[in-house]
Amino acid sequence: MPLSTYPSVGKLLWLIENEPKVAAAHDKGTLAFGTVDAWLVYKLNGGPKKNVFVSDPSNSSRTMFMNIRTLQYDEALLDFFRIDRSKIHLPKIVKSSDPTAFGTLASTKLKGFKITGCLGDQSAALVGQKGFTPGMAKNTYGTGCFLLYNVGEKPVISTHGLLSTVAFDFAGQKPMYALEGSIAVAGSSIQFLRNNFKFIEESPQISALAQEVEDNGGVTFVTAFSGLFAPYWIDDARGTIFGITAYTQRGHIARATLEATCFQTKAILDAMEKDSGAKLSELAVDGGMCNSDLTMQTQSDLIGINVNRPEMRETTAFGAAIAAGLAVGVWETLDELRTVNTAGQTVFKPTITKEESATRMSRWTKAVEMCRGWSN
């Protein structure tokens, strides 16, 4: 994982150095730090009364000081980041699915109910899409965009700008690993057109606006509002629109905005194929942007494989439910889940040639290179 604002460690160090209350707690040895799941589980258990302070590997791997092979905190990484464990309490790392590790709810009508599953949101979406076996991948199109590719029981260390992470770690099984590619701006680019350019009143209207024109009219929009994440990792890139002419209409910019996420997804998938040595056969999708048929068809065209959209798209919540259910015997094996949520699936198939896809991608790559350095 490259040093960036993405992992937790930089935020922890900044807080210690810049926030007096955090610094004071650190000096006293009373500071506790973990990812948001650890805080939620701690609070749901009643806070200091029970003091259940735990996290699972899919979340802890994002701190940047967990060893993804041992699934425990790495002393060398802790030393590198100057993290003194005598002054900072870190959550215990436990299985993603466990009948006792996460405690019980301390209040509300569900008081006494066990918490039996915990996953990072993208790992939960992969599980919810039933990406249990190597070679399966999902892409969540939300405010940002997150693509996870299951690589199996051994981590694949990326050399092409991706994150090597823990997908999930269920009891009775070996942990499963994934390659992840993150796009900083996806659905938020539609919000930008709505709020800043006033192109639309509601975000779902973006597809209709984009379909007012046949293509992007030569417009390319690199939506690098805060730099570019995987596989580029260009911190000083900024949002840039190329190819505007007197002919350009709002629909062209709307279409180019939707295409930006699709181009970045293709770049990530290309990197995943290089890292894993295997070509993906299909892509499962979820998240708000996947409701746009135009966007999903564009995605299929660019990556040259089928894009599968389930009818029930709350796959992140479903994945969390699977983790919890496995711990208490709702399902005995993952095989029991393979046919769940398959009815009503929409499949988008490529409609352009590989050559046309490559031509479009070449233009996008050129635009990415030209948007470097604008924050300096």
PLM regions and their residue ranges:
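Glycine/Thr-rich phosphate-binding loops that ligate phosphate moieties of nucleotide
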Residues: 21-24, 34, 47-51, 149-376
